[in-house]
Amino acid sequence: MDTRFHCVYLLTSLDPQCEGDFYIGYTVNPLRRLRQHNGELVNGARRTSRRGRPWTIVCCVSGFPDDRAALKFEWCWQHPTASARLRHAIDILTGLRRLPYAVATLHLLVRASLFCRLDLTLHIFESALLQEAAARAEVLLARRRGAFAVGGGLRASSPRVGTQQHSQRSSSLQGQADGVATPPLPALDSKGELQDASTAAALATTTAASHLLPPLTPSLLFHVEDTTRQAFEDAYLSHDRCLLLPSVGMGVDVGEAGKEGSHMSASAGTSCPYDVSLLSQAARAEWSNASFASDSDDEDTRRFAPYCPSTGSRTPSPQRVHTAASPALLGYRSEERAGDGVLEASPGSSIGCGAALRSFSSPPPPRASSPRSASCPPLYTGINASASLAVDAPHGGVTDACTSSPAAAPAPQPRIPLRFADYGEVDFARAHAEEQHRLHHGLLPCSLCTLPLQPSCVAYCSRAPFCTLRCHLSCLAMWMLYAEAEAAATVDGTDKSPALLSQAPPAPISPLRRLIPSQPCPCPLCGVLLHWGSLVKELKKRVVVERRLHAAQRRIRMEQRWQARLAHIDHTKRSTSAAMRRRQRTRVGAAALAKGAGEAPGAASTVRASTMHVGPARRDAPRVSSPSCLGEPTLTSFAAAASCPSPSTSLAALSPAASASPISRHNGHSNTVTATNTAVAAAAAVSDASLLSLTDFCEEDWLLP
């Protein structure tokens, strides 16, 4: 599935010498492409590099299912006279040049039979330039048709002036007959430009008085939003768009649900593509103001209240044009018109009320007595209010689109299950987590064929999660084609009134018409109109957001594990360095011990070894004490004192009591006493030697003359 962002953009030059020059192109990132055209990045177009820099983006059209449809739109916009979609309607644009010509072509192209069934969105970056170009196109087209008088440009004897005066007189009489006041005509110079005195007023008056070009009116399948470059990048081009959702930023906690199974975690709300905060607020506000319907047959349903307090969305997305609804999220519509049986926004109320009201904006199918009409109700009229013109290729002309019948009775508003009355953010997050668990384990059946669904390619109703329609994309296409065929058979076989004949489907535009639905169909569960283009667009948007949510969660988990690993490494490094310092101090102490003790331990061991290996007679014989045993200092003691001349060590070496070898006696305890005294003297020498080895201080240096 191609989930890229396909759009066709319109550029215009800001160079005063190239005023009005335009460029039309296709890309998946219009902001990056604009930098390429301006020379900031490489791989720009040759046409925009020669002259006209700097360029600015006026608008772009998005919502194409794949690159082929977007490239077709681009080619038709670039070559309107050669296109089969506009060649029969492009004659009305004769005389237009530069940017007004491109804008007028856009007005006609979005209503062509090939593109009016797609869920397209017009993103306007420079609304002033777009409105000015459309107004100038209206003025020039009206002047070419002879509806305005050129001030001072032609002579009175010219036959063209007489034709213009006759047309002006006829239009004035027609306006008086209709009871409509004809606005004053603006004055034009010889070049066809408006005079400076009344430029803005003339443009506004001309646009309001004569609609030679079909207006860009938002509808179910055509959306208009006035945005900025930063908001556009955050909403459509940023890979961290999912992190801007309040449900992801807040980290909805599902409480004890994480202990029930492995598929539920404490952060299940972060994987929900819906704005659970907005859903809970809308449901709470709706149920607090809703009341039971008097003609309701089901006690478990309620009608939607006409009033709903406004609840702003925290999702940063551009504001829609000509609508007071909140920004649209996944699976919801926000541009439904009052002509389609939808509640219109009032100054004191918000038509959106978040995602809940957008999901309830379309009416359900009317009740019918026959089983056929109950299962497949007839299609609604007035589906796309923006499709005021449609090119009929076989007949070679521009025909008016089907309009809703004035005699049609207003359909009842859709109903909502009562189980959502007490739903909060945690409940929506838990329900979505459970549904995703069932979907990934093959436990979620299709609503139409009851076969298990596979992830990603699942079609949802526009009222999701309030509507439980979950089905395969192919099953939904077959259902819509079947409903369309049933409606056509009902119109052709039973009733042939003019109102129903206007609902007949148009002529097929391609051999693949039987595979792709071309008409909307009511939902089999809730009755809301489902448009194929909107469903495909929402499906791709859902797939993209879910992938980015999973990627963001994976990145967050990796960062947490990396931080934990770094903390463990830091702790290990600190403990290792402390152990190394302890070992170093131990080695220094051992070296000082060996240096302070000198040869005393070796001599004692030698004496003990010789004593152990002598014979019994030799051991019991009386021994003569050496002078050192009588208290005289030995050479070893003097050597130790000279090497580490401390007062305690010197005194211990010179005193008879501290000698290492006392007088030997003939009893058996003499060897034990000698060893004990030797160990005590060695310990005292070690402590003093350790202290002096750490300081390079020598007492004899101070005593020398």
Curated annotation (Swiss-Prot):
* Disordered, as annotated region: 155-192, 290-323, 595-628
Q: Where is the composition biased (Polar residues)?
A: 160-175, 310-320
Superkingdom field: Eukaryota
Q: Which cysteines are joined by disulfide bonds?
A: none
Zinc finger spans (SLX1-type)?
446-526
Which Pfam families does the entry link to? GIY-YIG
According to its UniProt record, where is this protein located?
Answer: Nucleus
> Main location per UniProt?
nucleus
Provide the GIY-YIG domain boundaries.
Answer: 4-90
Q: What does this protein do?
A: Catalytic subunit of a heterodimeric structure-specific endonuclease that resolves DNA secondary structures generated during DNA repair and recombination. Has endonuclease activity towards branched DNA substrates, introducing single-strand cuts in duplex DNA close to junctions with ss-DNA.
Outline the subunit composition: Forms a heterodimer with a member of the SLX4 family.
Protein name as it appears in the record: Structure-specific endonuclease subunit SLX1 homolog
Name its species.
Leishmania infantum
